[in-house]
Amino acid sequence: MAKLEAQQKDDLQEKLIAVNRVSKVVKGGRIFSFTALTVVGDGNGKIGYGYGKAREVPAAIQKAMEKARRNMVTVELNAGTLHHPVKGRHTGSRVYMQPASQGTGIIAGGAMRAVLEVAGVHNVLSKAYGSTNPINIVRATVDALVHMKSPSQIAAKRGLNVDEIRG
């Protein structure tokens, strides 16, 4: 079992996005703990994010990584970029991403960049609107990527060929 877990861990890229110290106020004072936000991906369209909380930083990061590995989704990519422009939203955060030509790179900020890198997107133009809270940006980015449809998915839904869809 441990060998299988280690092997699974090796082929995934892991990125730590944020670590915060949070406190709980009790009668005797404050109790400090730490939260960690992480993303993992295989660089080929599989991504997951996790949020962990513990009394120590390493434990919070480990919990977040485990949650990210458990909650992975698959995204259809088009040769290192997106199929079409997409929008995603989560609470007060909105993100917009559009495909870019070869050599453009990842034009994205902070948390969105980390998600796109581990997903395997190499060329994309993106913008975050509203709240730039890293948790909400990550969730909005994953939401946008999940709702992106490839031409083959659209053709299958309409009962047509891909050539008929593209015109």
UniProtKB/Swiss-Prot annotation:
Free-text comment on this protein's domains from its UniProt entry: The N-terminal domain interacts with the head of the 30S subunit; the C-terminal domain interacts with the body and contacts protein S4. The interaction surface between S4 and S5 is involved in control of translational fidelity.
Q: How does it assemble?
A: Part of the 30S ribosomal subunit. Contacts proteins S4 and S8.
Q: Which GO terms describe its cellular component?
A: small ribosomal subunit
UniProtKB keywords: Ribonucleoprotein, Ribosomal protein, RNA-binding, rRNA-binding
- State the NCBIfam families in the record: rpsE_bact
One GO MF term on file is:
rRNA binding
Does the keyword section mention Ribosomal protein?
yes
Known role = With S4 and S12 plays an important role in translational accuracy. Located at the back of the 30S subunit body where it stabilizes the conformation of the head with respect to the body.
What PROSITE patterns does UniProt report for this protein, alphabetically? Answer: RIBOSOMAL_S5, S5_DSRBD
Please report the organism this UniProt entry assigns to the protein: Shewanella sp. (strain W3-18-1)
Stored Pfam families: Ribosomal_S5, Ribosomal_S5_C
What InterPro entries would the database entry show?
A: Ribosomal_Su5_D2-typ_SF, Ribosomal_uS5, Ribosomal_uS5_bac-type, Ribosomal_uS5_C, Ribosomal_uS5_N, Ribosomal_uS5_N_CS, Ribsml_uS5_D2-typ_fold_subgr
Q: Which domain of life is it from?
A: Bacteria
What's the family? Answer: Belongs to the universal ribosomal protein uS5 family.
- For this entry, the protein name equals Small ribosomal subunit protein uS5
Q: Which residues form the S5 DRBM domain?
A: 12-75
